[in-house]
């Protein structure tokens, strides 16, 4: 987002999920379908791109999550609609998914997104429901199809060692792994219960690689102009670097989040929404001050921010 005129959308399609994990926040999943009509979604894509282009952002990254996004019956069609925009010279897509669909579904996803600049997936492994071998096979299928995959493992403190060992087995197969600290039910802080060694593992474990080389997905620049690379946004939470109140932030101007029908500037910000998918929304025309005391969502923390001294 620093190098390209890229507009970022983080989209929770709904809370409907085919899993019900014991550690999931109660408000983050539902067994009742809550998706909107297909035309509501396609109209939103078109309107976001129109307003973003008016702000000078001509390239796009859309990230879909839930709930479980693939549980939406027309999600494959929605991905195809988004991907078939040949006006944008750069388009990328990201999914956060439990990989529950079968090989055929993912084959269609690979084919329908093959022309995009970048495709990536956060594959959330949930030990209460997933089969380790089948899950690994889907990851390998996607990687061989040119999709950047990282397994996301919520590191529940009381199961830390078990989960770490399984993540090591995935890493041995050449699959990237992200160790995600568990947040409290309000999603405002990391839970207690981690040892110092476990904190170190969260901060440094499993560097991200692509085609045999370590990659950096975020950059920080200090007041002296020194650059620091991070291979994944979750490192910021692991290090506790997530307090940006009064920084100037591009959220709402170069990005937006969609949660249900609400369009907001960020997950962590508690101000009024920018609008809704059904009644309309308006993006900011310029960067604005951060208003939240803690920014624990990686979707928020990766948006460009500047701290002006004085």
Q: What is the predicted role of each segment?
A:
Residues 2-43, 268:
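Canonical Radical SAM [4Fe-4S] cluster-binding loop centered on the CxxxCxxC motif
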Residues 18, 69, 100-101, 128, ...:
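Short, solvent-exposed loop/turn segments at secondary-structure junctions
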Residues 25, 48-51, 59, 223:
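Glycine-rich short-loop/terminal segments
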Residues 28-39, 56-72, 86-104, 113-134, ...:
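Core AdoMet radical
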Residues 51-54, 82-86, 108-118, 137-146, ...:
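Acidic (Asp/Glu)-rich catalytic clusters
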Residues 74-80, 102-113, 133-137, 163-166:
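Distinct, well-ordered alpha-helical segments
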Residues 118, 130-229, 233:
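Conserved C-terminal portion of the radical SAM core fold
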Residues 188-310:
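Accessory C-terminal segments flanking Radical SAM cores
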């Amino acid at each position: 987002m620093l190098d390209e005129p890229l507009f970022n959308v983080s989209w929770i399609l709904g809370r409907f999920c085919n899993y019900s994990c014991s550690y999931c926040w109660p408000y983050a999943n539902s067994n009742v379908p809550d998706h909107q009509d297909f035309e509501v979604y396609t109209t939103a894509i078109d309107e976001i791109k129109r307003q973003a282009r008016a702000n000078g952002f001509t390239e796009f990254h859309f990230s879909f999550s839930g709930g479980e996004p693939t549980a939406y019956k027309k999600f494959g069609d929605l991905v195809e609609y988004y991907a078939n925009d040949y006006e944008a010279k750069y388009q990328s897509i990201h999914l956060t998914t439990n990989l529950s669909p079968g090989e055929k579904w993912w084959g269609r996803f690979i084919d329908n997104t093959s022309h995009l600049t970048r495709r990536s997936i956060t594959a959330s492994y949930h030990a209460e429901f997933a089969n380790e071998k089948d899950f690994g096979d889907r990851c390998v299928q996607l990687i061989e199809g040119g999709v950047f995959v990282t397994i996301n493992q919520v590191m529940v403190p009381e199961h830390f060692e078990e989960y770490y060992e399984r993540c090591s087995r995935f890493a041995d197969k050449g699959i990237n792994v992200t160790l995600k600290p568990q947040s409290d039910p309000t999603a405002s802080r990391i839970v207690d219960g981690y040892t110092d060694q476990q904190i170190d593992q969260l901060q440094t474990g499993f560097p991200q690689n692509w085609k045999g080389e370590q990659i950096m997905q975020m950059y920080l620049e200090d007041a002296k102009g020194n650059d620091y690379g991070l291979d994944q946004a979750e490192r910021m939470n692991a290090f506790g670097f997530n307090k940006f109140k009064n920084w100037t932030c591009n959220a709402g101007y170069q990005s937006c989040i969609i949660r249900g029908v609400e369009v907001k500037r960020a997950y962590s910000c508690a101000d009024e929404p920018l609008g809704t998918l059904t009644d309309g929304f308006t993006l900011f025309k310029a960067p604005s001050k951060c208003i939240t005391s803690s920014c624990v969502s990686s979707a928020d923390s990766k948006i460009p921010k500047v701290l002006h001294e004085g």
